[in-house]
């Protein structure tokens, strides 16, 4: 068994309840099963490649176009641009999902996992992510992560690499999470087995 430390995020809907939990809480879980994230879908690969290329070529073009001191300023600012456009989305992007100790951990590539309780899980079903409005997060750069909204699901969180084949998890108070494990069916079985509910698949 392995252990993982992570943060337990809170949802805006939870903040309206009389007993409001802490905004973040560090917790440890014993990992019982790990599900790698699905390969990055084609659209995301294109967005990632083009954005990364633009982040490299744009400063070079500006450097060549600016004389003297201005060119030096562009050169100094280039690393900050690369961090903002490329490194930050990579660090926060999903790498996989771990299940155990009554929690689901969303494993991220460069920072602590996010933990979601499985004991109160209402349903888990295989589905595709509909066209959605990105409210905060990444809309294809190394995947889809952050807060989104659409007409059918309302507001939800996503940590996915493939919108076509994923799993929608639902909790009380309207909390929804879309993920894209490589094996959605096995993932559904694992989370439902630890939720104490049959749920939908």
Predicted regions and their residues:
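Non-transmembrane, membrane-adjacent beta-strand/coil modules in membrane-associated proteins
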Residues: 11, 16-20, 24-28, 107-175
């Amino acid at each position: 068994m392995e252990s993982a430390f992570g943060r337990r995020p809170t949802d805006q809907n939870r903040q309206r309840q009389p007993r409001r939990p802490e905004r973040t809480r560090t917790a440890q879980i014993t990992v019982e099963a790990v599900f790698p994230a699905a390969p990055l879908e084609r659209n995301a690969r294109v967005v990632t490649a083009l954005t990364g290329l633009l982040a490299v070529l744009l400063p070079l073009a500006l450097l060549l176009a600016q004389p003297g001191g201005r060119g030096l300023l562009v050169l100094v600012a280039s690393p900050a641009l690369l961090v903002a456009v490329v490194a930050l989305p990579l660090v926060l992007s999903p790498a996989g999902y771990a299940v155990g100790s009554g929690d689901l951990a969303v494993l991220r590539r460069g920072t602590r996992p996010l933990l979601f309780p499985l004991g109160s899980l209402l349903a888990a079903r295989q589905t595709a992510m509909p066209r959605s409005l990105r409210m905060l997060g990444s809309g294809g750069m190394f995947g889809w992560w952050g807060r989104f909204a659409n007409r059918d699901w309302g507001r939800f969180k996503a940590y996915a690499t493939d919108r076509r084949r994923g799993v929608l998890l639902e909790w009380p108070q309207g909390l929804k999470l879309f993920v894209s494990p490589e094996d959605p069916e096995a993932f559904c079985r694992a989370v439902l087995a630890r939720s104490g509910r049959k749920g939908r698949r």
